[in-house]
Amino acid sequence: MFAGPGGLGEGFSTCVDDHDRPRFHSVVSIERDEFSHRTLFLRHFLRSFPSGEIPDDYYDYLNGRITADEMFRRHRPQFNDALKSAVKISLGPETHDEVRRLVRNRLAGRKKWALVGGPPCQAYSLVGRSRMMNHPDFAHDERHFLYREYLKIIIDHRPPVFVMENVKGLLSAQVEGEPVIRRIVTDLAKPKAAMEKRANGLGYRLYSLSEDEQPDEHVDPRLFLVKAEEFGVPQARHRMFIVGIRDDIDVKPGRLRRHKPPTVKETIGHLPAVRSGLSRGKDNPEAWRREILALTAGSLREQLNGAHYAKAILGRIRLHVSDDTFPLERFAMRYPGRPAKRHRALTAMHDSRLSTLHGHEARSHMASDLRRYMFAAVFAEVMERSPKLSDFPESLLPDHRNVDRGRSGEMFSDRFRVQLPHQVSTTITSHISKDGHYFIHYDPIQCRSLTVREAARLQTFPDNYKFEGPRTSQYHQVGNAVPPYLASQIADIIADVLDSMSDGG
């Protein structure tokens, strides 16, 4: 449920046993957003083929040789399978009966299955929450309680196991003085009591995926927090995962096993270098390089005077702008070889049949931002940290009303954030669709924010995973998704639970 572009589903579908046989089959995924659903549908279409037998037509589609419609026409049985399993519906009271029939028909009496998904409690995201909390309609906005639709699905179908994913902001959110997470935990443990005000009935034991101590209705909800970077994902992504096991099933889930993630450079460093575009005026390699060279022509030396890092940064900037290896193109189509780092997350991304690297096109930026990006990347290269606004010379400061407050550390002092090469990235969020200031590439000569493909790699999506729709939507899809590599590890735990059940369910 609430499938988005399919990160959770991808992880569950790629979870295999010791004989490389899939442990899960996705019988239905539901999503309401047009472009996310198109991405989801395409992936379900591919999964309708036997494992390892993606048709050549898919790669021709990625290469632009045929259209999606032509590909679907050539493979009608798989297209029809995807029509049944990837469904575009907006969950709510008006579609409840339709969803109930759909899920019942697709389950077809199966006893061993899992319900996965993250009801979109957008109001509790840490981003923008302070603005929403004081809104007079906040407590009564139906969007914030879409998880109740999730509860209705649990009541209707009594899944043996569910996995609910949501944002870290749930830990601190309150509505009318009540902690939201406490209410959600209570409701998930006794969904029928929550919806029908009954004292007993359907119940679930709730478990953490990352901690040995077992949560209950009164325990610290932070036990449900999963830090993706602790489990091999090259990104500091902290999300809530609550596993529910039906009361009549006497099985406890295992735990995720901590292991080291690859770094940003190990994950995206071997992708071809591309330059950003100029959003105003003529955009060509010469004009772009001219704007970069302007960084050394101003009063940068005087403005950095006194800073202990001034000489090193100025020297490094001159070195980079005199380099003849500036990338000339805004996009790269050539698919690179395997990354040098051997890591399960990186190996899972690679597809030797690819010849085209999809989604590796840099967005356009204002000329002033290009110079800010180069300064920020050089600063990070020298100082091994991303600069704060107080580190920027005045000539590079944005014309923004909050700059002074940012320089003093009051708010958004890290408005320009470099993704450091030898660490994991910061959280890839849907905000990347609006601007790239928080997602600056560490290579100074590229002067740009991350491409869709780089963001997707940091989210551990396979390189053959195509995101449909305009680029803004692609960024949004990537930022909102669950990393498939993490989802696959969760799927292993859930599969073990289901395998331990008696055949009677």
Where are these regions (language model features)?
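Short, flexible loop/turn elements at secondary-structure junctions
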Residues: 2-5, 34, 119-121, 168, ...
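Polybasic, glycine- and aromatic-enriched phosphate-binding surface used to engage nucleic acids
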Residues: 354-469, 473-475
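Extracellular structured ligand-interaction cores
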Residues: 27, 112, 223, 237-241, ...
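Core alpha/beta nucleotide-donor-binding catalytic domains of modification enzymes
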Residues: 3, 7-157, 168-182, 215
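Class I S-adenosyl-L-methionine
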Residues: 106, 126-399
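Generic C-terminus detector
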Residues: 470-505
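A structural signal for well-ordered alpha-helical segments within the folded catalytic domains
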Residues: 6, 10, 34, 38, ...
